[in-house]
């Protein structure tokens, strides 16, 4: 930084890498990883292609070295120099000019090494030696066989590395390595800013910011010294820049600063996301030393937990308002971390906002995302449920392990605590529940260590470094101490009876969870995504060797077929089966989410598993690895709409009737509900109609409804005892003025028995719109271009006979492209034609 005594030099230099012991070196990219460098240099095949995963896994039996040469200057009198590594994955030895300066053993930490007197004037050689993670966990497991998820490799619990790199029930065995974040040389004469902690005090018409600024002396970058507490010559100045550019400047080491008429930050769909830039400048005797710059949002955020008529509430409370959380669980974006960039993350999170998310849960089996992830969540209004990086395992809490994870916690809490989007810290994924059940536990000390880690160590760290952010000991949990972690009437729940338990979709309605932080259903990715890992038609069968290698949940393909036979007719073509699986997934999650939202106030969170994939695979994701939206993501856009009409129908499906056992009588009715997740009362016109399969109206009704802010309203039940369950359906809509803001349809039999007529789907293009026409009721209308990568304003929708207009919004892709390029591609592909189908075509 110009004019500051603390200098920061990034090693954006030329790097090279090789397999340790080999004479041949190859150009390397830092930040990056071993796999991405080997791919770039033609030294490995695509690990995602067919079963190449295993050849890629073998490469991690070896050690690797990275090396760069940089121009340095010797430390002057009074200066100290430090090497800073923001991300090393994972077991490394570091050498400067052939002298070992340190080693690392945690990818979740920042590592800094004192190199004062070791940097020469002129050329310096920096070398990083990566030890095989496979050899490391093998040796550690042989010494201490501590256990965890059976989907991962034995010993993964012994290394502070993203657990899912060793395999998961959606992930491959690809434990990549490398320098995945920047490397810097720090030169300082007076130390630096360690951290700035900003607490907010909200009152009517103003917000007071309270500042706790600490510094590190140049001799010890782990030592924290409060600024302004002693007469040592250190002072700081604060500048706050409002969204409109107005500046507030506070000099002379202010402990607080008042912002009048603040613009508050709200989650997406509830309000705006104005951000204030905060600059803190540290000086010594008037000489600028260092600067800290971040963006913050002005808001209060905690969890509202209090006894109520159903048990105990559990809701995000933002600016005093309880908000229903709507979103999905986020996993690492790519098995190859070198492919994750600010641009790829932006594309993914913008797709969350496009689908009306207001929250994401960062799952604990990966790694703490980059700063840009949280910056984007701040910008887009996505509340973050942040797991600490522990999942589905037990740990042996040795003194060394405890010291290691304490530093990990401090690093990440300091790094992330200022973010407006940070909704809560959570201790781990699914460990309280499984440890209580005795899963993976082989000795009593593992239970003791669990309690110590998540109910003592982490709370101690947070009490010191981030007391303002809510802490939850595990997910799921009812509050800790193994007190019924999956209690449906308290805390959060992971519900898997639909899917893992093979229960029908209707089972969701047996529960009124306070907050569902995991529930899911699998589907296959798009056909064009499948072709990225196999182009052989012999593989295009869900039980082929290659397709099962890209399905990591045991028995899941058969499970999809089991649910398929319950719901739809059997498809005779592979591509139709892919479509049917996505419709199953979308219908399953819709069944749950709409039920949870109808019971707003009792249930206050629906976070489905999962948002994304880290490689091309059959999974629970709503956006596949290539960025293509599955049917579920379009459904999410509708069932997470700020104002939504939904239907609680009683039909053959809810009765779970067995038509071959006996004559049965079951209720045929609907009860509509409108839920409003905005800060304004909404006046809507609700319309519904009983229709024949050709979409002709048998009986139509409408009702004007006022839905108070942040609430849901039920309409009266409508019974249809004489409905033709095989040939009639109900359509329903919510209108605000002249705009239909939400709609849907229900039938009274299983879809496989309903007598769908051929809707004779057709389309025409008008500017940036696709106009779809149907001559009968059509369920799940899918619009595809040849490369299956259009992003539309709506897709996989139900429609009665007539027309529906759909806007072309963009192109789905993991790659960052010039908008002009994809616009031209879309025009070319539209000229080649579109493919339309519906549930009628599942046959």
What are these regions (language model features)?
Residues 9, 17-23, 29, 33, ...:
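Substrate-binding clefts and catalytic carboxylate motifs of secreted carbohydrate-active enzymes
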Residues 1-359, 489, 598-599, 628, ...:
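Secreted/periplasmic carbohydrate-active enzymes, especially glycoside hydrolases
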């Amino acid at each position: 930084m110009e004019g500051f005594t603390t200098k920061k030099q990034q090693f954006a230099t030329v790097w090279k890498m090789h397999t340790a012991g080999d004479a041949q070196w190859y150009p390397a990219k830092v930040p990056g990883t071993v796999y991405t460098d080997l791919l770039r240099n033609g030294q490995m095949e695509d690990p995602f292609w067919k079963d190449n995963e295993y050849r890629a896994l073998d490469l991690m039996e070896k050690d690797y070295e990275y090396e760069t040469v940089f121009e340095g200057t010797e430390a002057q009198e009074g200066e100290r120099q430090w090497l800073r590594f923001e991300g090393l994955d994972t077991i490394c030895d570091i050498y400067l000019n052939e002298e070992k300066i340190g080693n690392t053993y945690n990818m979740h930490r920042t590592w800094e090494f004192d190199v004062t007197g070791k940097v020469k004037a002129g050329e310096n050689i920096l070398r990083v030696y990566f030890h095989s993670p496979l050899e490391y966990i093998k040796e550690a497991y042989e010494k201490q066989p501590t256990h965890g998820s059976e989907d991962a490799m034995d010993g993964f619990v012994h290394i502070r590395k993203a657990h899912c790199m060793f395999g998961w029930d959606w992930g491959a065995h690809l434990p990549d390595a490398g320098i995945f974040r920047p490397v810097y040389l720090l030169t300082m004469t007076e130390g630096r800013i360690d951290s700035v902690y900003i607490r907010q005090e909200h009152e009517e018409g103003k917000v007071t910011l309270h500042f706790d600024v600490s510094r590190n002396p140049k001799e010890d970058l782990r030592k924290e010294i409060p600024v302004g507490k002693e007469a040592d010559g250190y002072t700081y100045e604060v500048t706050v820049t409002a969204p409109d550019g107005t500046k507030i400047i506070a000099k002379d080491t202010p402990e607080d600063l008042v912002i009048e008429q603040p613009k508050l930050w709200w989650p997406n769909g509830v309000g705006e996301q104005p951000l204030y830039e905060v600059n803190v400048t540290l000086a010594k005797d008037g000489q600028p030393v260092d600067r800290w710059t971040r963006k913050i949002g002005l808001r209060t955020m905690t969890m509202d937990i209090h006894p109520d008529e159903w048990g105990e509430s559990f809701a995000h409370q933002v600016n005093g308002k309880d908000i229903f959380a709507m979103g999905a669980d986020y996993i690492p974006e790519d098995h190859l971390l070198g492919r994750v960039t600010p641009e790829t993350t932006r594309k993914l999170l913008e797709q969350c906002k496009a689908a009306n998310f207001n929250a994401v849960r960062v799952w604990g089996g990966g790694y703490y995302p980059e700063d840009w992830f949280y910056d984007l969540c701040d910008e887009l209004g996505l509340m973050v449920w942040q797991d600490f990086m522990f999942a589905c395992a037990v740990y042996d809490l040795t003194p060394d392990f405890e010291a290691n994870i304490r530093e990990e916690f401090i690093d990440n809490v300091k790094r992330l605590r200022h973010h407006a989007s940070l909704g809560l810290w959570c201790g781990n994924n699914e460990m309280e529940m499984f440890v209580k059940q005795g899963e993976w536990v082989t000795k009593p000390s593992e239970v003791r260590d669990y309690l110590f880690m998540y109910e003592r160590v982490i709370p101690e760290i947070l009490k010191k470094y981030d007391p303002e952010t809510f802490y939850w000991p595990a997910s799921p949990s009812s509050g800790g101490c193994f007190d019924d972690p999956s209690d449906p009437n308290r805390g959060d729940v992971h519900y898997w009876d639909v899917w893992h338990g093979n229960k029908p979709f209707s089972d969701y309605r047996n529960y009124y969870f306070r907050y569902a932080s995991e529930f899911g259903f699998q589907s296959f990715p798009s056909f064009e995504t499948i072709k990225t890992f196999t182009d052989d038609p012999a593989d295009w069968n869900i039980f082929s060797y290659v397709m099962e290698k890209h399905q990591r949940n045991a028995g899941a393909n058969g499970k999809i077929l089991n649910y398929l036979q319950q719901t739809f007719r059997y498809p005779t073509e592979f591509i139709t089966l892919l479509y049917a699986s996505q419709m199953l997934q979308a219908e399953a999650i819709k069944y749950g989410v709409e039920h949870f939202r109808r019971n707003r106030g009792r249930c206050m969170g629906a976070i489905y598993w999962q948002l994304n994939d880290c490689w091309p695979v059959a999974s629970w994701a709503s956006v596949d690895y290539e960025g293509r939206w599955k049917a579920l993501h379009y459904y999410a856009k509708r069932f997470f709409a700020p104002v939504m009409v939904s239907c609680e129908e009683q039909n053959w499906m809810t009765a779970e009737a067995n038509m071959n056992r006996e004559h049965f009588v079951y209720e045929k009715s609907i009860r509509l509900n409108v839920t409003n997740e905005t800060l304004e009362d909404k006046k809507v016109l609700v319309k519904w109609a009983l229709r024949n399969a050709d979409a002709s109206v048998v009986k139509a009704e409408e009702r004007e409804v006022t839905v108070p802010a942040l609430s849901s309203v039920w309409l009266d039940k409508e019974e249809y005892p004489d409905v033709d369950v095989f040939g009639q359906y109900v359509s329903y809509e919510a209108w605000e003025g002249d705009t239909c803001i939400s709609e849907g349809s229900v039938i009274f039999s299983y879809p496989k028995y309903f007598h769908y007529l051929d809707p004779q789907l057709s389309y025409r293009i008008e500017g940036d719109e696709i106009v779809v026409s149907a001559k009968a009721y059509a369920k799940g209308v899918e619009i595809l271009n040849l490369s299956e990568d259009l992003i539309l304003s709506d897709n996989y929708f139900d429609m009665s006979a007539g027309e529906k207009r759909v806007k072309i919004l963009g192109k789905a892709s993991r790659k960052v492209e010039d908008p002009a390029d994809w616009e031209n591609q879309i025009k070319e592909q539209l000229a080649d034609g579109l493919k339309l189908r519906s549930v009628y075509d599942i046959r």
